[in-house]
Structure formats: structure tokens, C-alpha cells
Amino acid sequence: LEIGANSGMDTKVLMQLARNAHVHCFECDPRAIARWRTIVKSSRTTLYEVALSDKTGEAEFHPSGGNPGGRWENYGQWDMSGSLLPFDRHKDNAPWMKYLDPIKVQTTTLDEWAAKTLPDNYVCPLIWIDVQGAEAIVFRSGVETLKHVHYVFAECDPRPNYKGQATRDELAESLPEFELVRAYPGYNLLFKNTDLVAPSKH
């Protein structure tokens, strides 16, 4: 599962790493959805134009804009920092960023989606998630689904970019069956499900 698929660049990487897997992708920003559908052309992926949240229905999504320049000069409006959470002090880290007006998006929960979509006794090797501070919200509404997941790779930026964003401890608390395996550059954390994955050998 790729939650927060954005333009599909990481989708293609996941497809290369797991050549026999089907990648289920979630994205709610219309600009990113358009990019994804241009970049990703494969029957091994499915894109769901919805935001995973703690309820099913409709919610405000806070899009990002602006242009960072440099290697992103030709990208256009920056759509990689939008969130269900309101912006806080993101401009402290990215002064060029613009906070765009909120838009309405459709939402569902991880558990509701899985119950409708995945077969019984499924196994999910990996959840890759980057939803700009709202990761714990997704996990708290996916308790049953997480029982079938081996690993979670999640972003957890400690900088106050969004109001109500999860801290590292709060993210860990939302994954009670998981333990932290490794922290990677870019504020990325890898967790493993200790009920499904054997302990590492030392």
C-alpha cells in the first residue's frame, strides 16, 4: 500500500522493488492525481482518489503551492506538502511555499477500504505512508488492517509543519504491534510487526 502517492514517482520505485506485487495507491490532491495518471502506466497498480482518515465522508484538504526552484524549477506548483491537517510553521523550513485555500476531498478509513477491497486472510508486505503529519490518524482507523501488515515505512518530521501532527512517540503508539527497526535520513522510520515478522538475528 502506498498512502500519499503524489505524482507516482515512488510508485514506480515500489513496482521495481516488488515485481510480483500489486501496489494500491491513495492520493486526494487533483494535481497529483493528474501527474500520477500520466507517469504510472501499469496493470499492477490501482489508484484510489481518496484520502485515508479516521472517518468516511468528506474533509478539508490543505494544498501546498509555490515553487522551490533548483532541480524542481520546471515542476510547476509544489503539490507535495498538502495535508488533511492545517499548516502551522511550514514556511519556517520552506519560505517559498504558498498555503493554498482548502478544498473538499473524499475520505475513508483504512479498515473500511480493506474490508471492501482485499480478500480474506490477505498479507500486506509493506505500507509506505507519507501524508504530511496525519500518519497516526490513518493508523488509528486501521487497527484490523495493520494485523496483516509486515512492515510500515513512515515519514515523521519533528518540525512543526502542521497543526496536530503526530510526534515520533505518538506514531509509535498508533502501531502497538510494531517495533521501530531503523530510522532513515529524511525523517523516515521503518517499523515491523512483531506478531508476523521473526526477530532479527544478531
Where do the PLM segments sit?
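Phosphate/nucleotide-binding beta-alpha loop and adjacent structural elements of enzyme active sites
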Residues: 1-202
